[in-house]
A protein has these predicted regions:
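Pre-Walker A segment
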Residues: 29-44, 64
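Short helix-to-loop capping/linker segments positioned immediately adjacent to catalytic or ligand/cofactor-binding
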Residues: 6-11, 43-47, 61-69
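Conserved hydrophobic/aromatic pocket- or pore-lining residues that grip, position, or stack substrates
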Residues: 56
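Extended, charge-rich, solvent-exposed interface segments
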Residues: 1-34
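A generic short-segment signal for beta-strand/edge and adjacent turn/coil regions
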Residues: 24-25, 46-47, 123-124
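Primarily single-stranded nucleic-acid-binding OB-fold modules
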Residues: 17-19, 46, 106
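Divalent metal-dependent catalytic cores for phosphoryl transfer on phosphate-bearing substrates
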Residues: 40, 51, 62-170
């Protein structure tokens, strides 16, 4: 419900549809909302993956106020889905699957997004290409300078969310 409330004000219907297409698939959405984000590092409780992902999306929005609105929403959605591959690389208890031992969760995540990206391309080709560019940078950040500098915010927001959760757990 929190993700739906966060996404509701998005003025880009094709982007909202993209998120619903991804998270509406039971094989993706169910684990996304119930799995931990990690086994023991951060957000390691049931539902931690969705909590962490939404924190990243919100932080990205807060960090990108000087950029055009469409770039902010595209990057925030990429932040929301940056760890989506964990639904294939982790088990409900946070241990890695055999696939997760072989392939990064970032790459598995992009693989999961491809069908929805293809549908997004039919209604908003520039948006689909922007997401491809952002996820390309997320998968291999040291390989290139991002054409969309907002992509760098995902990495920072990811670390901030993880560190903040560790701080909460340490001092609670």
């Amino acid at each position: 419900r929190a993700v739906e409330q966060w996404l509701q004000p998005c003025p880009y219907e094709p982007l909202k549809s993209f998120v619903y297409q991804v998270l509406g698939q039971p094989s993706i959405g169910c684990p996304f909302f119930t799995y931990p984000a990690s086994a023991s590092y951060h957000h390691c409780c049931s539902g931690g993956l969705a909590q962490h992902s939404l924190e990243v999306a919100k932080t990205v929005q807060g960090m990108t106020t000087c950029f055009p609105e469409h770039e902010r929403w595209l990057t925030a959605v990429a932040g929301l889905l940056h760890d989506i591959g964990k639904v294939r690389s982790f088990l409900p208890d946070g241990r890695r699957t055999s696939t997760g031992c072989l392939v990064s969760h970032e790459l598995l995540g992009f693989e999961l997004l491809v069908p929805a990206l293809m549908r997004l391309e039919a209604t908003w080709a520039d948006g689909a290409n922007a997401l491809r560019n952002i996820f390309d940078w997320v998968i291999r950040p040291k390989q290139q300078r991002p054409l969309m500098p907002v992509a760098m915010c995902i990495q920072q927001a990811d670390m901030m969310s993880a560190y903040a959760d560790n701080r909460r757990r340490t001092f609670s």
